Regions:
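Bacterial N-terminal signal peptides
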Residues: 2-13
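Generic detector of solvent-exposed, compositionally biased contiguous segments
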Residues: 29-57, 348-372, 376, 384-407, ...
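Aromatic-lined, polymer-binding surfaces characteristic
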Residues: 65-247
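Signal peptide-directed secreted proteins
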Residues: 211-250, 254, 258-266, 527-579
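Carbohydrate-active enzyme catalytic cores, enriched for enzymes
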Residues: 247-366
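Catalytic and substrate-binding regions of extracellular carbohydrate-active enzymes
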Residues: 310-480, 489
Length: 579
């Protein structure tokens, strides 16, 4: 009966604010330029944007071809409406009706309030459905309701109102905690604004408390749990910017100002001006290097004072300007002397601590503990100049895809990192939580650690060392030498060996742990599965010292450059490996 009341409530609610949307001729010109890149992808038959399939490797069972994206289509619809051009209104309304029709509106359903990623893959076929789509799509629909509802037909306006409230109820039901940074913020935005817009008192009380908890969580630590993420720190910045623009509650706005500052500090403090890259470590990232879209954001956020020659128009730049605090701007343009940043991202015993060393010739970042999921960059470095930048990062691959069960540990001193890897019996395969290894067992034909190079050095070919403990030396112009070493690597009875390769865009140096016929691997049966490595960015006359490695008492112990590290060598649950 409670669900029936909810449906009636959703249907009967009406918005309580009017639009004040304005756009000047210069802004309109840039918006139209951004829209032109999408106009050719509009499919009038399906009334959505059509695009080549792409995914992070989970949630979807699709493998390729072309798809119609719910989120991209809504972004396009908002952009069409933002022009204020009545001739584009029918297309925008058609998209809204089509995408809203794909939302699960049944309160008794497990997927209530969310959308599929693609028209071609209904919620029941996703693996699993992505509950974040209530947040992402709800946010976009709120832009329509706040700024363009009065231009919509009564039928479409009602559909938008109801859809937003279904999304808000879904977000409330799921109740994501403050550790899930970008969704914690985005869900707070949707529920805060929906409550104010539609007079939803219970949602409002929930949203204010949720946002208060996130504010306390982030500001007490001075960092986000999804730390230093080139992808999600920007998402967090954008959504806090929306809170500051649209939320009326004074306390929520005051809290948002502090979180907004925190996001910009994280970006500025980790930026490396010589390479124009966002230095690591990164908790979540879909690409190792930032590029024109990020540099354009910096240009727009500083009114052109940070100018790297890119100012690409964004669909939402008018509604979301995201100004950078003026006192942080110099971090994007100046680095005359080396600077080290030590940051506790997650307190605890032990804590998660990131180290970032910014040198005029390079940037090297590492985290003291984590894993090697596809989105992680726990050990990553950049060097070169802005137009000839290179990067290297550490990966663990299972049949060519990142193995999330690989646990990572490191210590760093300036340009030197001592690191080690072991494996968790209950860790993830392709995803840390959505694809966990069952019974410590999986099938594999290849397991390897990889030092992967991108940029200029991604097009070079390397010679692999003859012996495992022989360091790789890479001579870089400008007095910089890079050393990579793996003094120890064991996988059961196998000792690792070096291989090298490239695909034209990336080059790599691999430590192969197993390669052969596909077989079942039970991690619990491996008495030993561990590796140690050292990375040194050397300047001047600095040379590489041999790493001291030994195994005793079921631990691998490493000593090098005044640093020490010890890890268990036998696979065990995450809680054992990470304690």
């Amino acid at each position: 009966m409670a669900w029936i009341c909810l449906v009636v409530f959703v249907v009967s609610a009406i918005p309580t604010s009017a639009s004040q949307w304005q756009i000047n001729p210069q802004q309109l010109s840039r918006l139209r330029e951004a829209l032109r890149k999408l106009d050719g992808r509009y499919d009038p038959k399906e009334q959505m944007l059509r695009e080549p399939f792409h995914s992070p490797g989970y949630h979807t069972t699709l493998k390729g071809g072309f798809v119609h994206s719910t989120r991209s289509s809504l972004e396009y619809a908002v952009g069409l409406l933002d022009t204020g051009d009545d001739s584009l209104l029918p297309r925008a309304e058609a998209i809204l009706k089509r995408v809203i029709s794909l939302q699960d509106k049944n309160p008794e359903s497990k997927t209530y309030g969310i959308w599929p990623w693609f028209l071609e893959e209904p919620l029941e076929k996703m693996s699993p459905p992505d509950w974040n789509w209530a947040d992402f799509c709800g946010t976009l629909l709120l832009q329509v309701a706040l700024d363009h509802r009065d231009r919509l037909s009564p039928k479409v306006a009602k559909m938008v109102d109801e859809s937003i409230q279904h999304a808000a109820r879904s977000i409330q039901r799921r109740n994501v905690g403050p550790d899930y940074t970008n969704i914690a913020i985005m869900g707070s935005y949707v529920t805060l604004v929906a409550a104010e817009l539609y007079g939803l008192k219970d949602i409002g009380a929930y949203a204010r408390e949720r946002w208060r908890q996130f504010y306390l969580h982030a500001t007490s630590r001075g960092a986000f749990t999804e730390y230093n993420s080139p992808t999600y720190t920007v998402v967090a910045l954008r959504e806090v910017g929306r809170i500051l623009k649209h939320v009326k509650d004074a306390q929520a706005r005051q809290q948002a100002e502090a979180v907004y500052r925190l996001a910009w500090e994280e970006i500025a403090h980790h930026f490396h001006p010589p390479t124009r890259q966002w230095a690591g470590p990164h908790s979540r990232s879909y690409s190792t290097m930032v590029g024109p879209s990020f540099w354009s954001l910096l240009y727009q956020a500083t009114d052109g004072r940070v100018n790297f020659g890119h100012n690409e128009p964004r669909l939402d730049e008018v509604r979301l300007p995201l100004p950078c605090p003026p006192d942080l701007e110099h971090y994007f343009t100046e680095l005359t002397n080396p600077r080290q940043l030590l940051k506790t991202f997650v307190p605890g015993q032990p804590p998660v601590v990131g180290t970032t060393y910014l040198h005029p010739l390079y940037a090297l970042g590492s985290v003291n503990r984590g894993d090697l999921w596809n989105q992680r960059r726990p050990l990553v470095a950049y060097w070169g100049s802005s137009n000839s930048v290179s990067s290297v990062r550490l990966r663990c691959l299972h049949d060519g895809y990142d193995l999330a069960a690989a646990q990572f540990f490191s210590v760093q001193r300036d340009g030197a990192v001592l690191a080690a890897v072991n494996w968790a019996t209950d860790g993830g395969d392709r995803h840390v939580s959505l694809d966990r290894i069952k019974n410590a067992t999986f099938r594999a034909k290849d397991i390897r650690l990889r030092f992967e190079f991108e940029g200029v050095y991604g097009r070079k070919k390397f010679r692999e060392p003859n012996a495992l403990d022989e360091p790789v030396e890479i001579n870089v112009d400008g007095g910089l030498n890079i050393f990579l070493s793996t003094p120890y690597a064991r996988w059961g009875n196998e000792t690792g060996h070096w291989e090298s390769g490239s695909d034209g865009a990336r080059s790599w140096l691999d430590v192969v742990l197993y390669s052969g016929p596909e077989r079942e691997i039970n991690l619990k049966e491996l008495e030993e599965a561990a590796a140690g490595c050292a990375v040194l960015f050397a300047t001047g006359n600095q040379r590489f010292e041999k790493v001291d490695s030994k195994t005793e008492n079921a631990h691998l112990s490493l000593k090098w450059c005044g640093m020490e590290l010890s890890i268990p060598i036998k696979p065990a649950p995450i809680t054992v490996q990470q304690k």
